[in-house]
Amino acid sequence: MKLKSVFRSVLKYRKTNLSLLLLITYSIITLLYIFDHERYKLNLPKEDEHPEFNDLLETAWGDLQIITASFHPYTSKENDKVHDYLLKRVLEITGNSSFASVSDDKESERSILFQQQDPFNESSRFSRVTYFESSNILVKLEGKNPEEEGLLLSAHFDSVPTGYGATDDGMGVVSLLANLKYHIKHRPNRTLIFNFNNNEEFGLLGASTYFNHSWSNLTKYVINLEGTGAGGKAVLFRTSDTSTAKIYQQSVKENPFGNSIYQQGFYSRYVRSETDYKIYEENGMRGWDVAFYKPRNLYHTIKDSIQYTSKASLWHMLHTSLQLSAYVASNSLDTADQTPACYFDFIGLKFFVISAKTLFYWNCIFLLVSPVVAIGLYLISRDRMTWKSHSWLSWTRFPLSLAAGIIVQKLFSNDIIRSNPLTFSRNYFWPISAFFTQVIFTSYVLINCSNFFFPCADMKSLSIIELFIILWTILLFTSKLLYSSDYRYTGLYPLSIFFLLSTIAAILRLLALALGMRTRKRLGRECRDHHSNYSSHSQIDMERDGQENLEQPQDQFTSSQDDQASIQDDNVSTTSAGPSHNVDEDHGMDSSSQQHDERVPLLKGSNSMEEGLSTRENSLKLEYTDYAWIIQFLLIVPIPSFILFNSVDVIMDALNHTVQEGSKATFDVLRFGMVGSILMALPILPFFYKVNYITISLTALLFLISASKTLLVHPFTNSNPLKVRFSQNIDLSQGNAASVHVLGREGNFLKPMLQDLPSIKYSSTHINCTSVTNGMELCMYDGMQPNLLSTNGNTNISSMVKVHVLHNNRNSTERSPYEPIVAELLLEVKENRACTLTFESRHQAKSPVREITVYQKKNSAPQKTNITKTIKSASGINELQLHKLDFDQETYHIGVQWFPKLLTDGNLEDDKLGTKDELSVSISCYWGEYDSESVVNGTAVRKIPAFDELINYAPLSFSFTNEQKGLVIVKDAIIL
């Protein structure tokens, strides 16, 4: 009997038991989180267990060290060295293989001229034409069954000018080399193409050029390896559809890592990045975008180096791609289901996939069936008189307390915006913790105050039912979003899981009421009529706050007395109207009617409320009363809390550093944090009002600490720096001043840092800082002149870019007024690989340029040229981007054709000044090498000393990246 009493005491719905269970739940969630984030570091292949994998990893790590020895953007000479090294490694690996072929775009002089939508800004209406000379390296492994649709594996070997490219995309490149080495030893069934492509960073151009190669016709599937962060685990960022997601599920058995929340966030443009996968997808390929995704404040900076990554990160990408490519290469694929996929992994142990369309159908079933079942059970319980009647005060306290928590949260978020809006960049845990604890603390205070004055007999059950109603409304809204987005909102699946589990908990409660004995309520009424002062030694003290169960001194009770007390639970309608009537939720009895009285029968066989009820019924009711809350808790709290916590962490982990990219991103992150914390709080709110004083005290303390950290701590540190964008601009049309542009977030961060630079501090250099769009600040000052070229004389920066007009018939009398105007330009640019021409007419709203021609040989006389590429556009061309490989070839030869104003608007007005058909051409040329030297008059000097100064003297809480495709931009302009 004592063992039974102890067991019942431990499992009874008491403050201590609930608080302990909450502690256990969140401890398990924390341990799972740590396990998930650290486990991959312990899974490196060992030489004695997996010698082949160990060799692949060690070789890949060595390749990575060589590739990332220096910065190697497309605009640098180091880029050619990386190309040559990769070509050498590819030839070593393929050797004399009978089924391997190698194609080098640089050797074959492959180039393309094509019209391109801005790949990084889909909303841009700027019409762009791009000329690109490729140095992609392609390898074909012909499969045993060449009839099978081929698989492309792709990664880019260029970096940005300010990063070594260890994760972006050195790890992807060396993982491709490892995959190539593996498949050379294990010939695939289907044909594999490897694309080591160049110039992804400034237009996804290497991937675009792939479709100019004949091998592109062999491939249907693609694995793209990318780095949009700077380490950690490689995530399945995007996948084409449910079929490809299931292929990942079937192939990646060890350490799978993916979440369709990333996919939805990326397609919704919450991340201002893009990968080659976009190009492959637009060209009809299906596959997998596997990428590093964090931290973004180190992405594209000097810290994207081998020092800040690890073999564990490399192995995670390498092994993931190897498992996936080996499966695809050797198996027939079921690709019938092409609807978008919802997918996620469970701590790297299991990968789950469901079609977003199927999820929508299940949502519809849940939305239709659950209220029908709930209402049906409610009507049955009303008919059987087992449903408690509750006042409107009882029904409104849970939603009102939740609403109050949201209002207080909004006020707190306003304080964050005013005092420390970029706090998420440093550590998103503190603001999320502050939001979460504030919501549950507010709910606790309001519900318990309400229960003190207006006790509720069944607060937990009412809250669970109301939570079901709230989640039903949310699921209806999210299902509408899912349908209207053509099932592209693949990150909404956590709400479906949460709704399902909370629905089961609510229906179990309603089912218990519906199956209750109708005589019990009658007996309860009779007992109140005949024993208004009923009391016994088996009754414990009622809690003033109206909590649900009693903490009973077990030694004072007999078995039947326990049963008798439990019988009264949840079956007597008693909602008191004031503090003088204290109601116990379990027993539903008004404490004012339960004064101790001699007339109360004390013996087991006496007439009492259990009269007419069988011992079996008492036992069943006792079991439900004491233990049903545990079932409800286990349904509503652990699984939804883990999934929602993980989902919020996934979102914040990917987006927290985007607050540095503008005010819109800041508000997006803040909104996600607020909504996420509310969703994290919902599972425990029906129970939290009953926690003990230790738990609520710790909650209040955690809120105070979190709020203080959120509002007061500086948002940037050495390990979490503010990323600032740099460029040095020389506008030859306005002189030779080398104006340094530093772009970063507003908030008095940039100017104090710049004022401490030696070249500014000890001179009269003026810094001009202005607010630009989207909460960004641009600071400009005249910096030290760059030394882009080695020379034996004084460097004249104006000689870097020269524009020669070879032909222009705008004012020719031989041209008809209705005839397009034609001009030819020769750009003379030294040691350069990239320039951009922008076309504009002062008298026409849209660009009048309709045709661009790029000549292969850039000679001074047009009769010696050969036309290589021509492109036309009826809608007009705003911009021409030029990318060439040969540094020694110092000219770009361009032909431009544009419409006179008469053709575009039909206006015959006089043009006495002859200016209405003028075409303004702005030229910008880019240099991206800074970590090297030029020799000027026999002395070695740094190429971009202004950037060196920032790197050397700025606090470590700043990191620097390029603003444009080069660090130095020389500009000029002409009118044709």
Curated annotation (Swiss-Prot):
Residues 528-610 are annotated as: Disordered. Its cofactor is Zn(2+). Residues 582-601 have a biased composition (Basic and acidic residues). Glycans are attached at N96, N121, N189, N212, N217, N656, N768, N796, N811, N866, N937. Disulfide bonds: none annotated. Zn(2+) 2 binds at D168, E201, H300. Residues 549-558 have a biased composition (Polar residues). Keywords: Glycoprotein, Hydrolase, Membrane, Metal-binding, Metalloprotease, Protease, Transmembrane, Transmembrane helix, Vacuole, Zinc. It is an enzyme of class 3 (hydrolase). GO terms for biological process: proteolysis. GO terms for cellular component: vacuolar membrane. The active site is at E200. GO terms for molecular function: metal ion binding; metalloexopeptidase activity. The chain crosses the membrane at residues 16-36, 360-380, 393-412, 429-449, 462-482, 497-517, 628-648, 669-689, 693-713. It is a multi-pass membrane protein. Residues 1-15, 381-392, 450-461, 518-627, 690-692 are cytoplasmic. May be involved in vacuolar sorting and osmoregulation. This is Vacuolar membrane protease.
